[in-house]
Swiss-Prot record:
<dbReference type="GO" id="GO:0004823">
    <property type="term" value="F:leucine-tRNA ligase activity"/>
</dbReference>
<protein>
    <recommendedName>
        <fullName>Leucine--tRNA ligase 1</fullName>
        <ecNumber>6.1.1.4</ecNumber>
    </recommendedName>
</protein>
<dbReference type="InterPro" id="IPR009008">
    <property type="entry name" value="Val/Leu/Ile-tRNA-synth_edit"/>
</dbReference>
<dbReference type="GO" id="GO:0005524">
    <property type="term" value="F:ATP binding"/>
</dbReference>
<feature type="short sequence motif" description="'KMSKS' region">
    <location>
        <begin position="625"/>
        <end position="629"/>
    </location>
</feature>
<keyword id="KW-0436">Ligase</keyword>
<dbReference type="InterPro" id="IPR014729">
    <property type="entry name" value="Rossmann-like_a/b/a_fold"/>
</dbReference>
<dbReference type="Pfam" id="PF00133">
    <property type="entry name" value="tRNA-synt_1"/>
</dbReference>
<keyword id="KW-0067">ATP-binding</keyword>
<keyword id="KW-0030">Aminoacyl-tRNA synthetase</keyword>
<dbReference type="InterPro" id="IPR002300">
    <property type="entry name" value="aa-tRNA-synth_Ia"/>
</dbReference>
<feature type="binding site">
    <location>
        <position position="628"/>
    </location>
    <ligand>
        <name>ATP</name>
    </ligand>
</feature>
<dbReference type="GO" id="GO:0002161">
    <property type="term" value="F:aminoacyl-tRNA deacylase activity"/>
</dbReference>
<keyword id="KW-0648">Protein biosynthesis</keyword>
<keyword id="KW-0547">Nucleotide-binding</keyword>
<dbReference type="GO" id="GO:0006429">
    <property type="term" value="P:leucyl-tRNA aminoacylation"/>
</dbReference>
<dbReference type="InterPro" id="IPR009080">
    <property type="entry name" value="tRNAsynth_Ia_anticodon-bd"/>
</dbReference>
Length: 945
């Protein structure tokens, strides 16, 4: 039987037992403290992959740990049906999208007859909901499944609609014409979760300036309209296609084909014809501000997909423009517009040298520097007044000339608006970004779009202040959250079609998936009790249950719901809320988590904000983040089948710190599985040994060191330092038990080994609950997952016994290190121990001095000791293993006696033929390789022969 099958057989057996015994169904217990753990629920548009697994297993481990610590733990789960991801996949299947269908067939192993049914988005969502639930169960997640729901359940819709009426009352909802990222194929606004690669489309604005040219107008796009005074040419790409279109004022405008295909979603254009870029070259246009005639010139550096595909050339301040015009060998004028102390009069000209070096990065840095300095420190030149016609001179003199660039920019826009020569153009600044359907995202100006006003200063400030009351794991995620919240702007939150909750006051609009998933964690606390007709769940019902408004008598009388049931529902909400630990991937810091906090603060105030937010890194496969484009999506079901549940639980959570990405590969998984099998076999074997009753130093040492393990692992679980838990529980303890067996010559103390195994299994139960349960039942009939977490009070602590064995282990480590440095295997070892009591006392004082942060000089003066001795002892105190250093301050051992009594153990561990022990103070002892002179207390001199 493969290791995967071996562990899965164990896992599935205990999962059934736990489910039958309702182990994870949590109900209020007023005499017991609670912990409410939640994870960001998944989109049901494909099966769960190992990236999901990291977040869900981490939360499950934490929930299991807290349950064992005596808390009443609720860990629920639900499914996101809302919005465009599901609809996009469904429509892709309907179109016969080969990439999507191939992914379902080849990666997720879904039968083709099922895939054909995915053209119905509801069927698709239900299919993957059931698939995800089965996977979550296979993972061993301790979910209270009574509380599951989907975001299209009618009862959930009532809950969300109540929330949005509250937000409207509070003034956080507004409606306006505004640019949004938009999929032209699916015809709805999109966000991060709607795009390939989960890229958040970022919108920036440009100024489109009209340059008249006979019967036409070229529209040139620029981020720096104030430089128009220095525009001396228009540049077009001679190889590109250009469109002649009529605007709302019946002006015939010229822009690139690619620009037209994007801008038609923002501006009222009507296509009239088409021209090649090369046919536009030679036309004469007019600068609308200076009224100077300027040429239309060819330049392949013009990207027809950016802006309008027409560039106004300002060579005096734009290095690329200067380079382009220079390459044409055309005569052109250089008109300085902005002056600064840092840059020359014509900074664009200075780029020639950089261009000749052919160093694009250096040139880009120079251009960015020009933009930054001119915007923040630049002043518009006074002589700009001389460049404009008389009717503009007064405006330019009063509003633009001599003014700071950042102020003049707005005034230049005002001037262009008065001339009816400017429009605002929106671009995807981090484009191209693609919808999941494959279409490139554009910007569309939507009339009457509904927004949540995350820019509201009072709301935003309140949320920022509240972050101090939340514990963040990892801690640096708080700073990232602060930055995101500070920069949040109003966000479009409705779609015109798709699955989801209807906007209560505009039912043709659907609330999007990031906006109906903000306070849904409150819904978990009561959903299993809401068995009433939808019509009864009015706003007054939610106000009473969630906001404690009104009385049970009033609500009962109005809705016909028994008073006792209302009070019970409200009591359950108040018992569980707020969330004690909110878990997600770190990508959700960009959107979901800030929205989660904003909405909680708006609806509930500060008291119901989550007490902790945990964000984990990603899973990488083949050294890359999982992506369909890389072909490295790894379904969770496949991982479980290939490696086993317990292996997957460790591999996805515990081989790295929580903030770091984890590499998932076959070698790592197989290594974990093999170690788990070793642990299984070792414990099984130990429980069969009859053992002895005699208590010896190794027995007491084992109990004492387990006290330390309990402390370390407890702290690590609390801080979600799962790597420390993993290394301690699955490797360090395993090696410790093996050392114990060797120290006792396999004559184990039966009572002590059972006690230690009991502790070991409970330490591993949060991460590998199935393995722990299987082995626990060789000792007990109770469920280990319901047992108490180990306490240090369960084991006795003897410093002397602990020091003896830790001293032996340090010798083993030193011999191995020396062998490695010498490049040879040790066969014979000579050990010199230093039993000078004066030096031993001095070492204790050195350890205390270092703890008190005293310098070497202070230590020497206080103890009246010579420089050489003080330095050696002080340095030793610094490098001794902490396991020894902390003990020798309060206890002591006879080093030579300890080595002699355990010489067989040392020789077996080191695979030695011979070991000899001398006292370094024995004058008759030989000084082999000078090691006798090097011996210090607890740091013997070691000669390898």
């Amino acid at each position: 039987m493969s290791l995967a099958n071996f562990f899965n057989e164990i896992a599935f057996k205990w999962q059934k037992e736990w489910e039958n015994s309702k182990v994870y169904e949590a109900n209020p217990e007023t005499d017991k403290p609670k912990k409410f753990i939640t994870v960001a629920f998944p989109y049901t548009n494909s099966p769960l992959h190992i990236g999901h697994g990291r977040t869900y297993i981490t939360a499950d481990i934490y929930a299991r740990y807290l349950r064992m610590k005596g808390y009443n733990v609720l860990f629920p789960f639900a499914f996101q049906f809302t919005g465009t991801p599901i609809l996009s996949i469904s429509e892709s299947v309907k179109r016969g999208d080969e990439e999507i269908i191939s992914t379902f067939v080849n990666i997720y192993q879904i039968p083709k007859e099922e895939i054909e049914k995915f053209s119905d988005p509801t069927y698709l969502a239900e299919y993957f909901k059931n698939n995800m639930k089965n996977t979550a169960k296979k993972l061993g997640l301790g979910i209270d499944w009574r509380r599951e729901f989907t975001t299209v359940d009618p009862i959930f819709e009532k809950f969300v609609q109540w929330q949005y009426r509250k937000l409207m009352e509070l003034g956080y909802i507004k409606r306006e014409d505004s640019p949004v990222a938009y999929c032209p194929r699916d015809e709805f606004p999109v966000g991060m979760h709607d795009t390939k690669g989960d890229v958040e489309p970022e919108i920036t604005d440009l100024d489109g300036i009209y340059f008249p040219s006979g019967d036409y107008f070229f529209i040139a796009a620029t981020p720096r309209p104030e430089t128009i005074f220095g525009a001396v040419a228009l540049l077009v790409n001679p190889e590109a296609d250009y469109v002649i279109a009529t605007d709302s004022l019946n002006r015939k405008v010229i822009i690139s084909r690619q620009a037209y295909d994007k801008l038609k979603y923002q501006i009222s254009f009507r296509e009239e014809g088409e021209k090649k870029g090369k046919d536009l070259v030679g036309m004469i246009a007019k600068n609308p501000v200076t009224e100077k005639e300027i040429k239309v010139l060819p330049s392949k550096f013009v990207d027809p997909s950016i802006g309008t595909g027409v560039v106004m050339a300002v060579p005096s301040h734009e290095p690329l423009h200067y380079i382009a015009l220079t390459e044409l060998k055309e005569e052109f004028e250089l008109i300085p517009v902005i002056k600064t102390d840092e840059l020359g009069e014509l900074p664009g000209v200075e780029a020639v040298g950089l261009a000749q070096t052919r160093n694009p990065a250096e040139l880009k840095d120079y251009i960015d520097t020009i933009y930054r300095i001119e915007y923040h420190k630049g002043i518009m030149r006074e002589d700009l007044v001389d460049l404009v016609p008389n009717f503009m001179k007064e405006f330019v003199k009063d509003k633009i000339a001599g003014k700071l660039v950042k102020d003049a920019r707005e005034k230049t826009r005002e001037l262009l608006d008065m001339l009816n020569s400017r429009i605002t153009i929106y671009e995807i600044s981090n484009g191209p970004v693609y919808c999941r359907c494959g279409a490139e995202i554009v910007v569309k100006v939507i009339k009457g779009q509904w927004f949540i006003d995350y820019s509201n200063p009072i709301w935003k400030t309140s949320v920022l202040k509240s972050l101090d009351k939340i514990n963040f794991i990892p801690t640096d995620s708080k700073k990232e959250m602060e930055k995101i919240i500070f920069n949040l702007q109003p966000r479009a939150f409705t779609r015109s079609r798709g699955l989801g909750v209807r906007l209560p006051w505009d039912e043709k609009e659907i609330i999007d998936s990031l906006s109906d998933s903000t306070i849904y964690t409150a819904f978990y606390t009561i959903v299993h009790k809401l068995k009433y007709p939808i019509s009864l769940l009015s706003d007054k019902f939610w106000d009473y249950i969630l906001l404690d408004r009104g009385t049970a008598d009033e609500i009962s009388k109005e809705l016909g719901i028994p008073k006792e049931q209302l009070e019970e529902i409200k009591s359950e909400f108040k018992y569980w809320y707020p969330v004690d630990s909110r878990h997600s991937g770190r990508d959700l810091i960009q959107n979901h988590l800030p929205y989660y906090l904003f909405h909680h603060f708006a609806i509930f105030g500060e008291k119901f904000l989550p007490r902790q937010i945990v964000t984990n890194g990603f899973i990488r496969v083949g050294g890359k983040k999982m992506s369909k484009s890389f072909g490295n999506i790894y379904p969770l079901n496949r991982a479980i089948d290939e490696y086993g549940v317990e292996t997957v639980r460790i591999a996805l959570t515990s081989t790295s710190s929580i903030s770091d990405d984890i590499e998932f590969n076959s070698n790592i998984a197989k290594s974990i599985a093999e170690q788990l099998k070793k642990i299984h076999d070792l414990i099984s074997k130990l429980l069969e040994i009859e053992g002895v009753n005699e208590r010896r130093d190794p027995d007491v040492w084992l109990l004492s060191i387990f006290r330390r393990y309990i402390e370390d692992v407890d702290k690590a679980y609390e801080n979600l330092d799962l790597r420390t838990v993993y290394m301690t529980v699955y490797y360090t303890i395993y090696e410790t038990i093996k050392d114990y067996i060797e120290l006792t010559n396999a004559k184990i103390n039966k009572d002590i080994i059972k006690k230690v195994i009991s502790i070991w299994l409970r330490l591993m139960a949060p991460i590998t609950p199935h393995l722990a349960e299987e082995l626990w039942h060789k000792m007990s009939n109770t469920f280990v997952v319901k047992e108490k977490f180990p306490s240090i009070n369960e084991v006795e602590y003897n410093e002397k016994s602990l020091l003896k064995v830790e001293y032996l282990r340090s010798i083993i480590e030193d011999v191995n290190r020396l062998s490695s440095e010498l490049g040879k295997e040790a066969e014979k070892v000579v050990i010199y121990v230093n039993d000078d009591n004066n030096l031993r006392e001095l070492l204790k004082k050195a350890i205390i001095a270092i703890k008190d942060r005293k310098s070497l000089r202070d230590f020497m003066i206080e103890n009246n000791v010579d420089d050489k001795t003080a330095r050696r002892i002080y340095e030793l105190a610094n490098v001794l293993p902490s396991t020894i250093r902390d003990l020798i301050v309060t206890t002591d051992i006879d080093e030579e006696e300890v080595i002699v009594q355990n010489i067989n153990f040392l020789m077996n561990k080191l695979d030695l033929r011979e070991m000899i022990v001398y006292s370094s103070t024995d004058e008759k002892a030989p000084n082999i390789l000078g090691k006798k002179d090097l011996a210090l207390p607890y740091k013997p001199g070691i000669a390898i022969l």
